Amino acid sequence: METSPTTCRTLEQYYHVNSKTLDKQYKDVLSDYRTWTELDHADEWLVFPDNIGRNLAIDETSMSNGELRTIVTNRDRHGKDQCLVAVVKGVKSEDVINALNHIPEALLSMVEEVTLDLSDSMRKIVRTCFPKATRVTDRFHIQKLACDAVQEMRIKHRWNAIQEANDDMENAKLEGREYVPFRYENGDTRKELLARSRYLLFKSGEKWTQSQRKRAEILFREYPDLKTAYGLSHSLRMILSKHTIKDAARLSMAKWYNKVEEAGFRSFNVIAATFYEHYDDILNFYTNRSSNAAAESFNAKIKAFRASLRGIVDEKFFLYRLAKIYAYPH
């Protein structure tokens, strides 16, 4: 239990002990939780200066009741022991900066690269606390914005299709005739076509199944704007997945901006404006092709541990266990 996310409930099955009793005894007697030096402020902030490295990741996660915490991890530790650098309550940049200032300045200055999402508060934290570090915006957050823009257009068309179907049913009822919806050659009605096209719009065309390929053909024929939007999203995916140098990526991104301007879609114009604000951070991805996958993976580990506990009753004790598993050496 000191070095792995094992629960007392799991041990109960193998050692025939009462899990509630073991949990209480571990908390009060077997562990050093009651004498833990970080206990007083654990629910506000935890920092582990010895775990800092040259490559960090910063992200936010929800631990209980939807309350967010900012997590800083050492990417070079790959989610193992001593990977946890800091856990701070909330996402307010001032609070996180104050917590990270407990780490000696010499250690903060040795950080060379920090991966983060598109959050302005995270950007401010990195700029203030790690002055010599290169900021790298996660490519998957960038791609997600484009995918969300395509899905937003699809959903808008779907609502219109649902309303159109409702109107047709009402008219058929008033005229005393049976309502027979129009169906495309693959058997989908208009609203079914738009509902069932959700997942294919997330994928590259070469990964479509035969039925998805047929559905996409009909969808793009009926809704040319979706075809254009999907093309913009796909071309951005190709730019980000291509192994190239920063200057070549800059040129490709500029051409993508021109396509967005020509398309005239509001959502993509907003994305382009967002990219412009984070332009250098996005292009820094091409230096080492670093992503925030380490932070996302660590978030998944926290959520899996929380799920195995069936929720968090004592947040301080949960943070103590996280620290024992991921912050201290084994």
What positions do the PLM features span?
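Short, basic interhelical loop/turn and adjoining N-cap
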Residues: 10-27
